[in-house]
Amino acid sequence: MASSEETPRSLAGKVALVTGAGRGIGKGIAVELAKRGASVVVNYNSAEKPAQEVVDEIAKTGSRAVAIKADITKVPEVSRLFQEALQHFGHLDIVVSNSGTEVFKPEEEVTEEDYDRVFNLNTRAQFFIAQHAYVHLRNGGRIVLMSSVAANMSGIPNHALYAGSKAAVEGFTRSFAVDAGHRKITVNAIAPGGVKTDMYDANAWHYVPNGKPGMPMEEIDKGLAAFCPLGRVAVPQDIGRVVAFLAHPDSEWVNGQVILLTGGSVT
């Protein structure tokens, strides 16, 4: 990871909403935006205590934050989330749709419930988050959606459900970028590879050659790091820093793009 330095508060005066921000990648994004001066809405669904801990961590950076509970798979909840965010901070400049879930299951065993659970959160929710962002963002705002390297990977078994749910988001990104352009709102997606979170801990062994359940985490990290020219796996801060760039005015000419965040990994 790059060395730690005092971060310029280049997003001072901006307000960001990050879904699924109580842990993992979402937490990393929320904290990096806050370090740069943004006020942050920390959305969560069930993990109230971790979300409040993120708010407390943000306060230590000198930025403001509020935790708002909302189940973003339900459109009325999405609407309420945006209304409460606006009531608290007055405006929105940046919306990051981060929430997601992952399933590995043989295609013949996937149930309707599996399909709906994955697509409701990974795909449907992201559409309506982006829709509400378009309606409520100030002109010149930023929308960042969450895809995955899995959307374009081949050779990973039992992965169609997750890969398909993320591939759809890439289509949303390109289309929304066209529709939002007249308001100078940019829309991009990020597509991370493995990032050290609780989801990584549960599923990363699937991506390791000859991986198996119960593999020691050190072996998993070593196996995945071997694919990366930088010799390591990602941490949430890596993803947050890229989102912070996309949120910055300097990123205006980056629009309608899906940005792979793999450290150059080739798998």
Swiss-Prot record:
Source organism phylogeny: Eukaryota, Fungi, Dikarya, Ascomycota, Pezizomycotina
Designated name of the protein: Hydroxynaphthalene reductase-like protein Arp2
General function of this protein: Hydroxynaphthalene reductase-like protein; part of the Pks2 gene cluster that mediates the formation of infectious structures (appressoria), enabling these fungi to kill insects faster. The product of the Pks2 gene cluster is different from the one of Pks1 and has still not been identified.
Superkingdom as given in the UniProt entry: Eukaryota
List of catalytic residues: S147 (proton donor), S148 (proton donor), Y162 (proton acceptor), K166 (lowers pka of active site tyr)
Organism expressing this protein natively: Metarhizium majus (strain ARSEF 297)
InterPro entries associated with the record: NAD(P)-bd_dom_sf, Sc_DH/Rdtase_CS, SDR_fam
The EC number(s) this enzyme carries: 1.1.-.-
Family named by the database record: Belongs to the short-chain dehydrogenases/reductases (SDR) family.
Residues annotated as binding NADP(+): I25, N45, D71, N98, Y162, K166, V195, T197
